């Protein structure tokens, strides 16, 4: 099972597309959405949201492979993503605009991996849509179903 852990107050922009992939993946992917912390102090927002992500992972997903989406990290093809997640429970972390304290996450979770969908900046809901679509492609690889590799 894969979990998409994101900080969000709305996914309304692409909710029908996200729901379509969620139906296709059925129980293979679940969403765990944390409410964003709102404050004018961006450093405080980063601190509070990092704490929230850490607590959630420790409580629910400690045994899962932890993967942080970050625009400046390693680019993967769909096949490489499949090889990274093949037959494992994974929690994918999508952060809110100000980011998370990556050093704190890395020190807390030594098994944290980082992947990227490119150097562009995209809204969290679009990253979520791209991720769930890629997870669907990975699922088709797993079951040997053709889906425009």
Feature locations, PLM:
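N-terminal beta1-alpha1 ligand-phosphate binding loop
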Residues: 1-26
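Catalytic-core regions built around general acid/base machinery
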Residues: 21, 83-86, 108
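Conserved RecA-like P-loop NTPase ATPase core
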Residues: 67, 95, 131
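Structural signal for conserved beta-strand scaffold positions within catalytic alpha/beta enzyme cores
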Residues: 5, 33, 68, 116-117
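S-adenosyl-L-methionine/SAH cofactor-binding core of RNA-modifying enzymes
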Residues: 26-91, 99
């Amino acid at each position: 099972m894969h979990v998409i852990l994101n900080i969000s107050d709305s996914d309304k922009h692409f909710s029908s597309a996200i729901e379509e992939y969620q139906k296709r993946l059925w129980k293979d992917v679940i969403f765990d959405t944390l409410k964003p912390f709102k404050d004018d102090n961006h450093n405080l927002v980063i601190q509070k949201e990092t704490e929230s992500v850490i607590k959630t992972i420790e409580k629910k997903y400690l045994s899962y492979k932890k993967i942080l989406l970050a625009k400046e990290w390693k680019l993967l093809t769909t096949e490489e993503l499949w090889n990274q997640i093949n037959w494992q429970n994974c929690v994918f972390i999508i952060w809110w605009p100000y980011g998370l304290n990556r050093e704190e996450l890395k020190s807390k979770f030594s098994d944290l991996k980082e992947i990227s969908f490119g150097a562009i900046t995209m809204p969290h809901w679009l990253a979520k849509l791209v991720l769930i679509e890629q997870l669907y492609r990975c699922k088709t690889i797993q079951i040997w179903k053709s889906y425009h590799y």
